[in-house]
A protein has these predicted regions:
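Conserved, mostly hydrophobic/aromatic
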Residues: 29, 65, 105, 128, ...
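Structural recognition of the beta-strand scaffold that forms the well-ordered cores
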Residues: 13-16, 32-37, 71-76, 101-107, ...
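N-terminal carbohydrate-binding/catalytic regions of secreted carbohydrate-active enzymes
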Residues: 8-77
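Extracytoplasmic Gram-positive cell-surface binding/anchoring modules and repeats
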Residues: 251-264
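Repeat-associated, polar segments at repeat-unit boundaries in modular proteins
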Residues: 268-275
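Solvent-exposed loop/turn segments at secondary-structure junctions
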Residues: 19-23, 38-44, 77-83, 108-113, ...
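Functionally critical loop-and-helix segments that line ligand-binding/catalytic clefts
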Residues: 6-28, 32, 152-240
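Active-site groove signature of glycoside hydrolases
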Residues: 92-120, 124, 138
């Protein structure tokens, strides 16, 4: 099964960007892979370089990554409309990248009317598979994992987990907190990443596999990669590293965690202290 990452391979480092990083030079900001947000909902969303639900800087962002030898992924931000309609909107807008870039669903609480509906990401993934022949990877915050749990075996979807130990500024980490705890293929461990060539903050990720594994997710027919062995999730540690509550409070005020109940989920055990 491809859906669960191996315990030890040549892991890769990368960042994910969206309409908030318009103009970033993906050729020079260091990474093994770059993931680009391409579509939101089924249109009608604007902001940054986002026009009618499409990231107008995505082609340039992806070209810089490809031309500098990086692997790529493209994601769709779920807004919770009809899942098949959103899947088609995504596929229609990333046709040139299918079987070259990993296809991803961004499943999170903010601006998502279907948050909490376990069937929505499954229907979206099935439609993407029907249209492209590719099983997408599913991104969600650790507190939302229950909604997508089982998609690894049901639909052969890799899982990408977001969970932050602290909000301190950091570069790439070799062993992020809790990595592998969900048997995930990829882990996003900060939204306060700092890399040379970009003055803003970035989401940083570790992919638990090598380039051949990445390409196998992008193109299941790729003969260059063997299927990955499956691993059992490790039990979750009971204590998190020290959390910077002031930074969490600042991000809460800024709206990073949305509103209750999503905010309560995102902040987890720090909810009372931050609020």
């Amino acid at each position: 099964s491809m859906a669960v990452a191996p315990a030890a391979m040549a892991d890769m480092n990368g960042y994910d960007i969206s309409n908030w990083q318009c103009g970033i030079d993906t050729a020079t900001v260091p990474a093994d892979f770059v993931i680009v947000g391409t579509t939101w909902g089924s249109g009608g969303v604007y902001g940054g370089c986002l026009s009618n639900g499409v990231n107008t800087d995505a082609n340039r962002q992806l070209a810089g990554a490809v031309n500098s030898g990086k692997e790529t992924g493209v994601y769709h931000y779920a807004r919770g409309g009809n899942p098949e309609t959103e899947a088609r909107f995504f596929v229609d807008n990333v046709r040139g990248y299918i079987r070259k870039s990993v296809l991803i669903l961004d499943w999170e609480a903010q601006d998502n009317a279907a948050w909490g509906d376990k069937q929505w990401p499954r229907r979206w993934a099935r439609e993407v598979k029907r249209l492209t022949g590719v099983n997408p990877i599913i991104y969600t915050m650790d507190s939302g994992y229950w909604q997508v749990a089982g998609m690894e075996t049901e639909l052969n979807c890799g899982i990408w987990i977001a969970q932050y130990a602290t909000n301190m500024v950091t570069g790439y980490q070799t062993a992020p907190w809790n990595i592998g705890a969900r048997g995930e293929v990829m882990r996003q461990y900060t939204s306060n990443g700092s890399l040379s060539g970009w003055s803003g903050r970035l989401d940083l990720n570790k992919f638990r596999g090598d380039r051949a594994a990445w390409r196998k997710y992008a193109n299941p027919d790729d003969k260059g990669a063997a299927d990955l062995p499956s691993v059992k999730p490790k039990p979750q540690p009971t204590t998190a590293p020290t959390v910077d509550l002031n930074a969490l409070a600042a991000r809460t005020i800024r709206g990073d965690f949305g509103n209750d109940p999503a905010r309560r989920q995102a902040l987890g055990g720090n909810y009372a202290a931050v609020m």
